[in-house]
Amino acid sequence: YINYKNMSHQHMLMMFNLLPVGSNISIWWNFGSMLLTCLVIQIMTGFFLAFHYTANINLAFSSIIHTSRDVPYGWIMQNTHAIGASLFFICIYIHIARGIYYGSYLNKEVWVSGTTLLILLMATAFFGYVLPWGQMSFWAATVITNLLTAIPYFGTTLTTWLWGGFAINDPTLTRFFALHFILPFTIISASSIHILLLHNEGSNNPLGSNSDID
């Protein structure tokens, strides 16, 4: 009698043991790859949602309801995109906490590129939050963009340019949709730089121990 299940289990363990990763890597090192997975999911679901979205203040909310109710599997895309955004932030905060705990901020290039990624992600999330153009979307767009007026000399001009007028209106929503669509591709570029810098410095080994010791 041959226990094929046990053999396949042992084979799988052997495959994982062949990976050049020492036991000094813990579960907290998973979140970087989880963030990349989140990014792929968000781009894929967002791409399909963009097919059915209308960047118009009178039609935006209706187009989202239409996606949820009438488009085949639209509700899955919409919910995955919304929940995926929350998961994205959970993962990135754990990822940052791990970096703070292990002193990864000492690796300045990787840390600065990561901080840039966080700012880009927060900007993308903000623009996406405004897109349904519900009551909270309107409030968020007004309050957050008004912060730009605090910039001396050209703050008011910058705010007017971002709004596309003297108040939040249709041009604002169009611009926010364009920015929400293009920023994830900027995040991909910044992530590539982050990963290149990461492997250049060997940030996966904060203790400085031999990765092949076991």
Curated annotation (Swiss-Prot):
Localisation: Mitochondrion inner membrane
Gene Ontology molecular-function annotations: metal ion binding; ubiquinol-cytochrome-c reductase activity
InterPro entries hit by this protein: Cyt_b/b6_N (IPR005797), Cytb/b6-like_sf (IPR027387), Cytochrome_b_N_euk/bac (IPR048259), Di-haem_cyt_TM (IPR016174)
Keywords tagged on the record: Electron transport, Heme, Iron, Membrane, Metal-binding, Mitochondrion, Mitochondrion inner membrane, Respiratory chain, Transmembrane, Transmembrane helix, Transport, Ubiquinone
Family annotation (PANTHER family): CYTOCHROME B
Misc remark: Heme 1 (or BL or b562) is low-potential and absorbs at about 562 nm, and heme 2 (or BH or b566) is high-potential and absorbs at about 566 nm.
Protein name: Cytochrome b
Organism: Gloydius blomhoffii (Mamushi)
Name of the gene encoding the protein in the UniProt record: MT-CYB
